[in-house]
Amino acid sequence: MCPLFLLKQKSTEVKNMRYHNITKDDMLNGDGLRTVLWVAGCDHGCKGCQNPVTWDPNSGLEFDEAAKEEIFEQLNQSYIAGVTFSGGDPLYWGNVADITELAKEIKEKYPKKTIWLYTGSLWESIVEMDILQYVDVLVDGEFIEEKKDVSLKWKGSSNQRVIDVQQSLKTGTVVLHT
């Protein structure tokens, strides 16, 4: 079900990516201690979503050089394992170009840091996207409230998958991250 404000938007309207928060020292959204970028914009509208405030792509703050530098300052710390893109949905159409460029820049500047990405989209529908060459782990699938399980690691509902992106691209089949 698409949120009403998205139905009112023009599909040709292009905005700079916006975000709600940059979380530092996060241990819940991927392996190790991480920095998390919570982007604005999501058209999945999952019932029971933990972050419905991030659905509106015009909410939050504009992702600018200062925000990027804030992420880079964290990634400069040896104890930070990497960055996680969440939201909202980093693969929301209005975010894809900016998040791909950011992921590319992070991989070039910090090749030993990992990039995790959470999306409501399924692997099979995004496997051809350029961003995946920079992503290490992808958590795919919409959150389904009826399949919610708080004991699951790195995901909210049992239908979601935690995918090793590079191995999956290499083998041509979904390889789960362990």
Question: What residue ranges belong to the model's regions?
Answer:
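N-terminal [4Fe-4S]-dependent radical SAM core
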Residues: 7, 12-38, 51-57, 174-175
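Conserved Radical SAM active-site core
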Residues: 15-19, 33, 51-116, 121-128
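A generic structural signal for alpha->beta connector loops
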Residues: 16, 112, 134-135, 159
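Short pre-active-site segment immediately N-terminal to redox-active cysteine/selenocysteine motifs
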Residues: 41-45
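Structural recognition of alpha->loop->beta junctions
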Residues: 76, 127-147
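P-loop/Walker A phosphate-binding loop and immediately adjacent motor/lid segment at beta-alpha junctions
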Residues: 93-99, 104-107, 148-178
